């Protein structure tokens, strides 16, 4: 039976802590895994803090199996993410069946909370990939995690001035509200359409831990790239989107990112690279990053999309993609002319 966490489940959560698999890479690498704290916060806030926890108890005596699953979802948001499932998969069918029950429950709960899709990130060689497929998830992309260990004497990046960091022919500066048109256009021109169903547009989820920066052409003022930096107690996580015809500026983007993202105290820095951004791996390796993990980003839709082809069929094509992304030049919106609009 699967139930929502309550105070009687505290011993079980403590018992399963460290025995499962994190499925939200950014959260795990920056904030760490805090099952009991998350469960208690969500319990006290009656689920409104977006970290609902569910426990499962099955069988009796020596055949008893206990498990838990944790979800991250802000009520009404389009996407939910699985934070953690425990215990890890084992060769016996009993644990696999427990996982399938939890995954089905998470899908139904996510849909009831307003989410249209449920996302999980798991190691590409993990048995979890096949179990998630059985539960109706599909691989939308592969993601490489690269790691850079900053030396103990690294100088903190500090606060980035509003005018930004000079990176040569470009500057890397904090995102402003007027940049959102260019950022959304950049995202539409770089992320494959199917993947856009799995991840929110950059800049739409800034919070106390996450900050956004744009790489701007100093001469023309065009937005060439967007950098997302999430800092937490245990690490930093970076992700970038760069216009296809601006790949020659990628070196300036990485150099600027390393200057602004250095933490006050030594913590590892991670860069998430989707498969369609493979050209970025070599550049990061030249700057000291090493391959740390290879993951499958898997998605299940909680509602049927009217008029859309099945997501599973489209996802299969993405595993061996031949991307031909149309490029629209990111520019400024034309000024609004009320007189001209009135004549039309």
How should these model regions be labeled?
Residues 1-62, 66-69, 134-235:
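Amide-forming acyltransferase catalytic core, primarily the GNAT-like/NAT-type
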Residues 5, 57-59, 69-70, 121-124, ...:
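Structural motif
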Residues 54, 80-83, 103-107, 118, ...:
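Short, structured motif recognition centered on aromatic/hydrophobic residues
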Residues 77-93, 232-247, 251:
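Conserved acetyl-CoA binding element of GNAT-fold acetyltransferases
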Residues 92-108, 134, 247-261:
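Conserved acetyl-CoA-binding loop-helix of GNAT-fold acetyltransferases
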Residues 110-122, 263-275:
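Conserved GNAT acetyl-CoA-binding A-motif
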Residues 123-125, 135-159, 268-344:
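Active-site/acyl-donor-binding loops of N-acyltransferases
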Residues 129:
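Phosphate/adenylate-binding glycine loop and adjacent helical scaffold
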């Amino acid at each position: 039976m699967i139930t929502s966490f309550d105070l009687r489940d505290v011993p079980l959560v403590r018992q399963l802590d460290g025995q499962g698999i994190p499925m939200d890479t950014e959260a795990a690498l920056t904030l760490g895994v805090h099952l009991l704290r998350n469960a208690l916060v969500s319990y006290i806030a009656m689920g409104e803090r977006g970290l609902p926890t569910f426990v499962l108890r099955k069988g009796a005596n020596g055949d008893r199996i206990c498990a838990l699953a944790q979800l991250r979802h802000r009520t009404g948001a389009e996407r939910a993410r699985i934070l953690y499932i425990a215990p890890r998969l084992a060769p016996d069918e009993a644990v696999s069946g427990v996982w399938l029950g939890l995954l089905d429950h998470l899908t139904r709960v996510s849909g009831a909370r307003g989410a249209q899709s449920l996302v999980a990130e798991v190691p590409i060689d993990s048995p979890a990939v096949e179990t998630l497929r059985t539960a109706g998830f599909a691989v939308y992309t592969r993601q490489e995690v690269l790691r850079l260990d900053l030396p103990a004497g690294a100088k903190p990046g500090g606060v980035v001035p509003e005018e930004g960091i000079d990176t040569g022919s470009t500057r890397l500066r904090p995102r402003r509200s007027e940049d959102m048109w260019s950022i959304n256009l950049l995202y539409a021109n770089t992320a494959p359409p199917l993947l856009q169903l799995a991840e929110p547009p950059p800049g739409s989820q800034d919070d106390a831990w996450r900050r956004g920066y744009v790489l701007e052409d100093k001469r023309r003022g065009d937005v060439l790239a967007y950098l997302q930096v999430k800092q937490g107690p245990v690490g930093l996580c970076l992700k970038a989107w760069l216009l296809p015809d601006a790949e020659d500026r990628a070196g300036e983007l990485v150099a600027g990112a390393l200057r602004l993202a250095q933490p006050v105290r030594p913590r590892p820095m991670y860069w998430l690279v989707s498969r369609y951004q493979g050209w970025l791996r070599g550049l990061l390796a030249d700057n000291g990053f090493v391959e740390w993990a290879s993951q499958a980003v898997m998605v299940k839709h909680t509602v049927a999309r009217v008029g859309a082809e099945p997501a599973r069929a489209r996802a299969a094509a993405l595993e061996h993609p031949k991307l031909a992304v149309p490029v629209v030049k990111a520019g400024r919106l034309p000024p609004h002319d009320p007189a001209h609009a009135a004549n039309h």
